[in-house]
Regions:
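Short, charged/small-residue-rich alpha-helical element at the C-terminal edge
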Residues: 215-279
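A general boundary/transition motif marking the beginning of the first structured unit of a protein
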Residues: 1, 88, 101-102, 236-237, ...
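ABC transporter nucleotide-binding domains
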Residues: 4-6, 11-184, 189-203, 209
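Extreme N-terminus of proteins, especially the signal/transit-peptide cleavage junction
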Residues: 1-2, 216
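Charged, amphipathic alpha-helical segments
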Residues: 208-216
Length: 279
């Protein structure tokens, strides 16, 4: 079952066509990464899905509803973590979550959400005294307090230290385990590679690649094989690394040589992203 269906989506601002007829679906319970450089159309697309911006053309269904015609009950099923915070500085972490819980008919327990986002030791600290990364964790908690079915996460780990990022990743994985659907936008390509079941790469308002991260890295960029032979450093690039490694090993065995310093450097999602978004 699809949580999000987009067909032929278009949006222009005057003469600038920000989104140019894109199509994609997000399955229920999936983490979907929407990637692309600034100005690619990500924000416009997400705001249309959230119901905050009207489209010019195309079909959009989110949880079975056109966001432009959505009811308050539909909005309760949507959680949004914005890139910029709008927190109450004089409230504590727990007070903040209780305030936002009051906007929903069936919210999650605020103390449970505090633990979920790793702020247990900060639950009684005022927002203004939190670090930037801790405030982002509170933003994530606010996005989850209504127990939504679909969560939009816009750059969710900006400002996090490495440990906090790993904690946030585990939280997002737990959401998937609970059957929640997540749309993730991020500039951290390792984050998308770790979390997303599928990704779509936007450039100039069109989707230039879509698929599982492992599929995207499977053949679009050549694998690099490095080794030393007779003191000479050798670098080879191939789209069939398994076959080439077999050939190199057979050649070395036949000659009684060692393949010193052998390394196989497979393309990452970042390599694919840079190739696809290059001007």
């Amino acid at each position: 079952m699809s949580a999000v269906t987009v067909q032929g989506l278009r949006k222009a601002y005057g003469d600038l066509e920000a989104v140019r007829g894109i199509d994609f679906t997000i399955e229920a319970g999936e983490v979907f990464g929407l990637l692309g450089p600034n100005g690619a159309g990500k924000t416009t697309t997400v705001e249309i899905l959230e119901g905050y911006r009207k489209r010019d053309a195309g079909l959009v269904e989110v949880l079975g509803t056109d966001p432009q015609k959505a009811s308050p009950a539909w909005h309760e099923q949507i959680g949004v973590m914005l890139q910029s915070s709008s927190l109450y500085p004089n409230l504590t972490v727990r007070e903040s979550l209780r305030v936002f819980a009051g906007y929903y008919s069936r919210p999650r327990d605020p103390d449970e959400v505090v633990e979920l986002v790793g702020l247990t030791e900060k639950r009684d600290v005022r927002v203004r005294r939190l670090s930037g990364g801790q405030q982002r964790r509170l933003d994530l908690g606010i996005a989850l307090i209504g127990d939504p079915q679909l969560i939009f996460l816009d750059e969710p780990t900006t400002g996090f230290d490495p440990g906090a990022r790993r904690t946030a990743w585990e939280t997002i994985r737990n959401l998937r385990a609970l059957g929640k659907t997540v749309l993730l936008t991020t500039h951290y390509l390792d984050e998308a590679e770790q979390l997303a079941d599928r990704v779509a790469v936007l450039r100039d308002g069109v989707i230039v690649r879509e698929g599982r991260p492992s599929d995207l890295t499977g053949g679009a960029v050549e694998t690099e094989i490095r080794y030393r032979r007779g003191g000479e450093a050798i670098v080879e690039r191939t789209q069939d690394p398994t076959r080439r490694l077999h050939e190199l090993t057979a050649e070395a065995l036949a000659r009684g040589e060692e393949l010193e310093g052998l390394e196989v450097l497979r393309p990452t999602l970042e390599d694919i992203y840079l190739e696809l978004t290059a001007e």
